[in-house]
């Protein structure tokens, strides 16, 4: 089975990744679940020997690693994880699980903020007190969401072993005429090894009719970074917004 999976992803080795189906892994009813072929591709392409996954959701990563015969540990906000190798973890407030620290690669496919309209706490799993919703990235306004996600990425990057890799799959969102780009707003620690475009298939929005001036979003982005062997220095790039009144600028004409 492992060899069949490797042959399938190897035949599609490209910076534009296009897998028409999500594969037989995980729960396809779990909103926001990514294609298992993406995780399988990363394992093949980067020779991953053990994988950690944050925002493990519907169990896709666990199932892929089972079929590719490598150790796996996941973490998710869900108090009742769907697999026994997924830990209940609040990525916002909890420390990085010790089980994550020695893995070859950390994979993340985070929620995309409140703008996309996919909440998890209280929707995909019960949240009777409302406490989990406060740490649910899927319920945070965009700026709060990106600030929180960037802090999580840096926290988990700091805990990674030198020489290990992190892959983050992310998407763009348009809501009420405003375009939000995760790739534009996300922090990039370490050394960037590769960026990928991942084509979207079988989306809920595919059946909708749009005006001619509207461009449907048909892709996601992913970066793969590596933590340098020098464990005492953390280098990163983070976007920031700045506003200037041109009336106060000496360069204005």
Where are these regions (language model features)?
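Class I S-adenosyl-L-methionine-dependent methyltransferase catalytic core
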Residues: 1-253
């Amino acid at each position: 089975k492992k060899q069949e999976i490797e042959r399938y992803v190897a035949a599609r080795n490209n910076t534009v990744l296009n897998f028409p189906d999500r594969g037989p892994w995980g729960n396809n009813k779990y909103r926001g679940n990514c294609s298992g072929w993406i995780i399988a591709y990363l394992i093949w392409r980067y020779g991953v020997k053990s994988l950690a996954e944050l925002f493990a959701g519907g169990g896709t990563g666990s199932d892929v690693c089972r079929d590719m015969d490598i150790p796996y540990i996941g973490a998710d906000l869900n108090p009742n994880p769907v697999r026994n190798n997924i830990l209940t973890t609040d990525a916002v407030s909890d420390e990085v699980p010790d089980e994550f620290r020695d893995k070859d690669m950390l994979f993340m496919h985070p929620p995309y903020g409140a703008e996309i309209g996919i909440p998890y706490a209280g929707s995909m799993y019960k949240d009777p007190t409302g406490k989990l919703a406060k740490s649910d990235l899927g319920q945070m306004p965009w700026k709060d969401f990106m600030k929180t996600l960037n802090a999580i990425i840096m926290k988990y990057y700091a805990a990674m072993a030198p020489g290990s890799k992190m892959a983050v799959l992310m998407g763009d969102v348009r809501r009420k005429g405003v375009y939000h780009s995760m790739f534009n707003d996300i922090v990039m620690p370490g050394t960037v090894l590769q960026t990928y475009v991942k084509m979207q298939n079988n989306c809920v929005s595919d059946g909708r009719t749009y005006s001619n001036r509207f461009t449907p979003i048909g892709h996601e982005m992913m970066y793969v970074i590596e933590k340098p062997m020098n464990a005492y220095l953390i280098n990163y790039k983070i976007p920031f917004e700045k506003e200037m009144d041109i009336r106060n600028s000496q360069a204005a004409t």
